[in-house]
């Protein structure tokens, strides 16, 4: 048994979708996404720049910061392949930083859907009983 949908209802739904996508609320949502820290940090890799399909420069990050001096200002990751003053190779520095970051992420408790997962048990963030 099929459901019958009249053409006029499809047209009305199409017009509603068109109106919503062109409205101020939708553009505000798009604008708020573009001003989010994630988009500012990684958005340059997803959107096209003035060069069309040209690959991004190695001396600039996605948010337009210049890293030609070898250090990324935000994360402090050593990007240059020149040897540092302390004699440690840049590959070793990067490897150590990535291992440290992985350890920090591993130790952080995961949060999903209002619950914190610790030791394989699901604990609610809100306590419903008396403590």
UniProtKB/Swiss-Prot annotation:
<feature type="propeptide">
    <location>
        <begin position="123"/>
        <end position="131"/>
    </location>
</feature>
<dbReference type="GO" id="GO:0005576">
    <property type="term" value="C:extracellular region"/>
</dbReference>
<dbReference type="GO" id="GO:0031854">
    <property type="term" value="F:orexigenic neuropeptide QRFP receptor binding"/>
</dbReference>
<protein>
    <recommendedName>
        <fullName>QRFP-like peptide</fullName>
    </recommendedName>
</protein>
<keyword id="KW-0964">Secreted</keyword>
<feature type="region of interest" description="Disordered">
    <location>
        <begin position="48"/>
        <end position="131"/>
    </location>
</feature>
<keyword id="KW-0732">Signal</keyword>
<keyword id="KW-0027">Amidation</keyword>
<dbReference type="GO" id="GO:0001664">
    <property type="term" value="F:G protein-coupled receptor binding"/>
</dbReference>
<keyword id="KW-0165">Cleavage on pair of basic residues</keyword>
<dbReference type="Pfam" id="PF11109">
    <property type="entry name" value="RFamide_26RFa"/>
</dbReference>
<feature type="compositionally biased region" description="Basic and acidic residues">
    <location>
        <begin position="120"/>
        <end position="131"/>
    </location>
</feature>
<feature type="modified residue" description="Phenylalanine amide">
    <location>
        <position position="119"/>
    </location>
</feature>
<feature type="compositionally biased region" description="Polar residues">
    <location>
        <begin position="97"/>
        <end position="106"/>
    </location>
</feature>
<feature type="signal peptide">
    <location>
        <begin position="1"/>
        <end position="25"/>
    </location>
</feature>
<comment type="similarity">
    <text>Belongs to the RFamide neuropeptide family.</text>
</comment>
<comment type="function">
    <text>Ligand for the G-protein coupled receptor QRFPR.</text>
</comment>
<dbReference type="InterPro" id="IPR024565">
    <property type="entry name" value="P518"/>
</dbReference>
<feature type="propeptide">
    <location>
        <begin position="26"/>
        <end position="94"/>
    </location>
</feature>
């Amino acid at each position: 048994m099929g459901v019958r949908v009249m053409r006029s209802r499809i047209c009305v739904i199409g017009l509603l979708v068109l109106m919503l996508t062109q409205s101020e609320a939708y553009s505000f949502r798009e604008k708020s996404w573009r001003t989010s820290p994630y988009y500012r940090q990684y958005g340059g890799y997803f959107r096209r720049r003035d060069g069309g399909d040209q690959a991004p420069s190695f001396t600039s990050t996605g948010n337009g910061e210049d890293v030609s001096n070898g250090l990324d200002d935000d994360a402090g990751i050593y990007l240059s392949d020149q040897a540092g003053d302390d004699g440690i190779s840049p590959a070793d520095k990067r490897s150590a930083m990535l291992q440290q970051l992985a350890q920090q992420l591993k130790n952080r408790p995961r949060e999903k859907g209002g619950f914190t997962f610790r030791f394989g048990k699901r604990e609610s963030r809100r306590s419903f009983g008396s403590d």
